[in-house]
Amino acid sequence: MQIEQLQINEIDNLHQVSSVEVGQHLYWQIGNFQVHAQVLITSWVVVAILVALPATTTGNLQSIPTGTQNFIEYVLEFIRDLTRTQMGEEGYRPWVPFIGTMFLFIFASNWSGALLPWRVIQLPHGELAAPTNDINTTVALALLTSVAYFYAGLYKRGFSYFGKYIQPTPILLPINILEDFTKPLSLSFRLFGNILADELVVAVLVSLVPLIVPVPMMLLGLFTSGIQALIFATLAAAYIGESMEGHH
């Protein structure tokens, strides 16, 4: 009996360990599913900002752009040039909206973690933070990149696209298959790790020295957040362009 009781206690302890979560989360119950409310709330705010900014500033377009219109056109040209550089002149145009959406959403999400006072809003459980501070968001972006990667290859090359998995030798088939999934996932973990680390460092410094010292770290965080958005969008465009060209 004592041995059985010890085994039951060990199983209970393992169950408690497996149910441990990092931080507290707010969930919405929709049918039989639990939805991560914090990520949805902050993501909706970021999307609303991205939609409202051009909608409110481009109502009266001018042939010679000035002010906000000039800035928005500059951003669009930057995204177009980025996509064209990674994919080439042929076939890059249909992918400009996808790469642009990726870049702008990640950029705005990263900056929202430093500029918006998320923690002022009180929740029953947990606290609000940048959408890219959550691994669910970055993995979802990686999965979208994977879907776009496969779609671009199949649309451009048909079923001959799968021939790349046995190049240069069929022995590399498992590695080539794994590579297609690890490339976008590595982007997601890099983005998640950088944004989470940045917010944790700033939070620790603010708690220790709440005045001048955290400011340089916040400025550095804004810079690295922009760089992370650029890296994700650039590599996503490069992977899609690679799938259409059919070489590694």
Swiss-Prot record:
It is a multi-pass membrane protein. It is found in: Plastid, Chloroplast thylakoid membrane. The keyword Plastid applies. The chain crosses the membrane at residues 96-116, 135-155, 200-220, 221-241. One of its GO terms (molecular function) is proton-transporting ATP synthase activity, rotational mechanism. Key component of the proton channel; it plays a direct role in the translocation of protons across the membrane. F-type ATPases have 2 components, CF(1) - the catalytic core - and CF(0) - the membrane proton channel. CF(1) has five subunits: alpha(3), beta(3), gamma(1), delta(1), epsilon(1). CF(0) has four main subunits: a, b, b' and c. NCBIfam families: ATP_synt_6_or_A (TIGR01131). This is ATP synthase subunit a, chloroplastic. It comes from Adiantum capillus-veneris.
